[in-house]
């Protein structure tokens, strides 16, 4: 006897087997259980998320500091270089990698090495190594030392190019701002002197400017210079204030190595940060650092490449150097890493990478303190000197930080003078 297929399907739907009913009921109960557990977790967690993946930054701390709920803080987690756009910009950078989309409001004020955003070639120094230690200082509530900051004495905008046919270096002093801001003296006018080092040959002296704080120099100078001298010479830009007794007082100086500019290939234009000449005399060596920030992973990478011409403490003739890198927030130590010790070497090559987890929302509150120290048998190293890098620093420290933010995902290398502690 033939059975109608349609009637058979209807009979199965109207009167399903008992085991199918059990399967459906178990599935429904499982879904209800999962939904109930999820709702319970959301209710008990309130407005706070699960523990932050960043070891040094908990969003509870962000709420406490900024007085915002986590949701509001999360919505504000946009990189500072995209948060604001300046309405007035200086001369555009000549480096192709510095596009408008990648920069922030200070891009027109990058310092003397704004051309250094190229890839860091570490091949001569061997394989890149991870830092030896990562001593944790991530207790948010802990109070630790507050380190001092360097101070800038204004900025000057300059441009220069080299005429290979006539072997002539052309230098233009365009403008200055925030000049002569010194607490110990008052000046009504100033002028600038450009000299060629190490011979201290005078390239040019500007006219005296009466409005000494934000002024337009618009001065152009030229000096004969052999192409081979570009690898050896430096330019010094010095600002002098004129006091009420008509005395010329040095108020700020900056030196620029011509070897880093590639002037035979392209002109240079940028802002230079002036510093106290007395501070420049406190240098006890130089250190080459590379910085990069990966916004997608919110990761800050510091590479301690090498140091040179280190001067040991207490007139020592030999020492074993190493480098400590502190991540600071509002002057407080949040994390610390250090390199391996190099035995008896005033020109050590470290080539060690240090990685910090840094949310973009706190980038503007951060700075780096890089300390060169001497290892000792008792485990307490004497500090040789330090470098401050960040938005609150000055000179090369600010320049390097700004350049890192302007060329995201790419390492930016720069030499820094090591200041005596």
Curated annotation (Swiss-Prot):
What membrane topology does the annotation report for this chain?
A: Single-pass membrane protein
Q: Which residues lie on this side of the membrane: Vesicular?
A: 1-18
Localisation: Cytoplasmic vesicle, Secretory vesicle, Synaptic vesicle membrane
| Pfam families reported for this sequence | C2 (PF00168)
Mention one GO molecular function.
calcium ion sensor activity
Residue intervals on the Cytoplasmic side: 40-421
Q: Which SUPFAM superfamilies does this UniProt record tie to the protein? A: C2 domain (Calcium/lipid-binding domain, CaLB)
**Keywords, A to Z?**
Cytoplasmic vesicle, Membrane, Phosphoprotein, Repeat, Synapse, Transmembrane, Transmembrane helix
Q: How is it modified after translation?
A: Phosphorylation of Ser-97 is required for mossy-fiber long-term potentiation.
Which cellular component, as a GO term, is one annotated location? presynapse
Listed GO biological process terms: long-term synaptic potentiation; presynaptic modulation of chemical synaptic transmission; regulation of calcium ion-dependent exocytosis; regulation of neurotransmitter secretion; spontaneous exocytosis of neurotransmitter; vesicle-mediated transport
Primary place of residence?
Answer: membrane
Phosphoserine is found on 97, 99, 214
> Can you give the residue ranges of the C2 domain?
152-272, 283-416
- Tissue specificity, please? Expressed in the brain, specifically in neurons of the cerebellum, cortex, hippocampus, olfactory bulb, brainstem and spinal cord (at protein level).
Membrane-spanning parts? 19-39
Fetch the InterPro entries from UniProt: C2_dom, C2_domain_sf, Syt12_C2B
**Family assignment?**
Belongs to the synaptotagmin family.
Q: How does it assemble?
A: Homodimer. Can also form heterodimers. Interacts with SYT1.
Q: What does this protein do?
A: Synaptic vesicle phosphoprotein that enhances spontaneous neurotransmitter release but does not effect induced neurotransmitter release. Unlike other synaptotagmins, it does not bind Ca(2+) or phospholipids. Essential for mossy-fiber long-term potentiation in the hippocampus.
Note the PANTHER family from the entry: SYNAPTOTAGMIN, SYNAPTOTAGMIN-12
Recorded protein name is Synaptotagmin-12
Source species, please?
Rattus norvegicus
The beginning of the lineage is: Eukaryota, Metazoa, Chordata, Craniata, Vertebrata
């Amino acid at each position: 006897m033939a059975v109608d297929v349609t009637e058979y399907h209807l009979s199965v739907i109207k009167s399903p087997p008992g085991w199918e009913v059990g399967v459906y009921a178990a599935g429904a109960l499982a879904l209800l259980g999962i939904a109930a557990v999820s709702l319970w977790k959301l209710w008990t967690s309130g407005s706070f998320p699960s523990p932050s993946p960043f070891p040094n930054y908990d969003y509870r701390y962000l709420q406490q500091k900024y007085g915002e709920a986590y949701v509001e803080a999360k919505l504000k987690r946009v990189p500072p270089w995209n948060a604001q756009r300046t309405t007035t910009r200086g001369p555009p950078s000549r480096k192709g990698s510095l596009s408008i989309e990648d920069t922030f409001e200070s891009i027109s004020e990058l310092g003397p090495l704004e051309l250094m955003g190229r890839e860091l070639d570490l091949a001569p120094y061997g394989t890149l190594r991870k830092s030896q230690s990562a001593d944790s200082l991530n207790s948010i509530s802990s109070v630790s030392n507050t380190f001092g900051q360097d101070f800038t004495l204004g900025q000057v905008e300059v441009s220069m190019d080299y005429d290979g046919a006539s072997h002539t270096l052309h230098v233009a002093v365009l403008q200055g701002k925030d000049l002569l801001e010194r607490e110990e003296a008052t000046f009504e006018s100033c002028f600038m002197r450009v000299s060629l080092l190490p011979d201290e040959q005078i390239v040019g002296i500007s006219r005296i400017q009466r409005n000494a704080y934000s002024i337009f120099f618009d001065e152009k100078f030229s000096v004969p210079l052999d192409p081979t001298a570009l690898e050896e010479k430096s330019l010094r830009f010095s600002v002098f204030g004129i006091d009420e007794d008509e005395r010329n007082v040095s108020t700020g100086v900056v030196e620029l190595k011509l070897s880093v500019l590639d002037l035979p290939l392209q002109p240079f234009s940028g802002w230079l940060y002036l510093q106290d000449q007395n501070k420049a005399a406190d240098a006890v060596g130089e250190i080459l650092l590379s910085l990069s920030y990966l916004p997608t992973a919110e990761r800050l990478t510091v590479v301690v490449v090498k140091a040179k011409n280190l001067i040991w403490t207490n007139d020592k003739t030999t020492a074993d150097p190493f480098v400590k890198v502190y991540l600071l927030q509002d002057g407080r130590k949040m994390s610390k890493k250090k390199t391996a010790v190099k035995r008896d070497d005033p020109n050590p090559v470290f080539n060690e990478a240090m990685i910090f987890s840094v949310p973009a929302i706190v980038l503007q509150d951060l700075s780096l303190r890089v300390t060169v120290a001497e290892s000792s048998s008792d485990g307490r190293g004497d500090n040789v000197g330090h470098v401050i890098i960040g938005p609150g620093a000055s000179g090369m420290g600010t320049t390097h930080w700004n350049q890192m933010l302007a060329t995201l995902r790419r390492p930016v290398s720069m030499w820094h003078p090591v200041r005596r502690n």
